[in-house]
């Protein structure tokens, strides 16, 4: 049984790529002959829908927290060009969420809007992931309500832990 203030915390934050979703196939199929990532292929809605696979243990964790009444928030550095494909992928794999926030498309000019339904702000598009997710936290979630964060990237995990948040790192993430 949980005791004290921890019982009042009702938000669990999940990362998407490398955490809820295994992106190995999408990443491998998006590499150019020169070894660099082809961002147009990597960020395309079709690539997300067809190549990403569910990370079942992490999805099960999200389902259990959701079933226990926790608010499930997904913060991702994923480009919002795939916002609707991401929502479709989450639904297809029974990933519950109350809020989904993706990085605004950084490859578009300033006239390009943030994806309809994505609550992110346009200034978030060029931030490194650890700064982006801190901004997302500050904008969309009360830090005092966060029970747990689940992520994979070392720099982001360090940021969460430096804020005093309990954080599970689901995979090595030195990138």
Regions found by a protein language model. Give the residues of each.
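Substrate-recognition "cap/lid" segment bordering the active-site pocket of phosphatases
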Residues: 80-147
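Alpha-helical substrate-recognition element adjacent to the catalytic core
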Residues: 8-108
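Alpha-helical hydrophobic/aromatic positions enriched in membrane-embedded helices and signal peptides
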Residues: 7-9, 143-144
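Short active-site oxyanion
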Residues: 70-73, 144-148
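Short, Lys/Arg-enriched N-terminal segments with co-localized hydrophobic residues
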Residues: 1-6
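Amphipathic coiled-coil/heptad-repeat helices and related helical stalk/stem segments
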Residues: 54-58, 130-133, 153
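Surface-exposed amphipathic alpha-helices with a cationic face
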Residues: 62-66, 138-141, 161
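Acidic, Mg2+-coordinating phosphoryl-transfer loop and its flanking beta/alpha structural elements
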Residues: 137, 145-175
């Amino acid at each position: 049984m949980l005791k004290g203030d921890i019982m009042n915390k009702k938000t669990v934050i999940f990362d998407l790529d490398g955490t809820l979703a295994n992106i190995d196939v999408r990443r491998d199929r998006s590499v150019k002959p020169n070894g660099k990532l082809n961002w147009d292929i990597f960020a395309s809605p079709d690539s997300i829908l067809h190549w990403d696979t569910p990370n079942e243990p992490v999805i099960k964790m999200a389902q259990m927290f959701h079933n226990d009444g926790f608010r499930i928030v997904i913060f991702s550095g994923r480009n919002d060009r795939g916002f609707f494909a991401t929502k479709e992928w989450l639904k297809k794999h029974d990933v519950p969420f109350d809020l989904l926030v993706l990085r605004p498309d950084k490859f578009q000019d300033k006239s390009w809007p943030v994806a309809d339904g994505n609550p992110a702000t346009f200034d978030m598009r060029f931030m490194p992931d650890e700064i982006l997710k801190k901004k997302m936290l500050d904008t969309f979630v009360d830090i005092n309500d966060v029970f747990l964060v689940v992520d994979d990237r070392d720099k982001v995990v360090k940021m969460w832990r430096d804020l005093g948040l309990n954080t599970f790192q689901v995979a090595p993430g030195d990138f």
